[in-house]
Amino acid sequence: MPTNNHVQKEKFAEDRALLSQQNKEYAESLAKDIAKKEEKDKIRFEAEQKELRKKTIQDYREKLKGTVSQGPLRLLVRYPNGSRLILSFSPSQPMTSLFDAIILNPACPDYFSVRSVYPRAEIHCYPAWYHTIFNAEFKDETEKGANNVAKETNEVKCLETIPNNSILYVNLIQ
């Protein structure tokens, strides 16, 4: 027959095991709650950053309104929705002038690439600020080694890189 002291020791051991199990479950639950909160905060932060990038692009478009470029270099630009725009440039204008003229059109998506039809090539006309925003928006793809479409341009002149009367396609990047 177990003694009273032996019963107390068993009861104490059971209580201690129960308390240990409860502490373990509490710690696991707390860790899950912290992870959920961190994930929620991360999603909220990323959404805020995405909205800030979109606002930066919209503000840039507003700043450009009313600017017109003219010159002997003519380019036909086709947008993803099928609309077309004929642009004229001076041979001395930098490549970023092409970016400005393309992004100013309401048919232009926020994130895009520009390709020429012939010769088939990527046209890098992006200013540094857009390059940064683009890479932030698509950081997962660029980290996986995907082709970095929005490569920053150097100040190469339009005429040196794009033949007159070229057709350029603006491609939506998602």
Curated annotation (Swiss-Prot):
- Tell me which stretches of the chain form a coiled coil: 8-58
Q: Does the keyword Coiled coil apply?
A: yes
Residues in domain UBX? 74-120
**Keywords assigned by UniProt, alphabetized:** Coiled coil
Please give the PANTHER family that the UniProt record associates with this protein: FAS-ASSOCIATED PROTEIN (PTHR23322), UBX DOMAIN-CONTAINING PROTEIN 8 (PTHR23322:SF93)
Q: What does the subunit comment say?
A: Forms a complex composed of deubiquitinating enzyme atx-3, adapter ubxn-5 and cdc-48.1. Interacts with atx-3 (via C-terminus). Interacts with cdc-48.1 (via N-terminus) and cdc-48.2.
UniProt-recorded name of the protein: UBX domain-containing protein 5
The organism is Caenorhabditis elegans
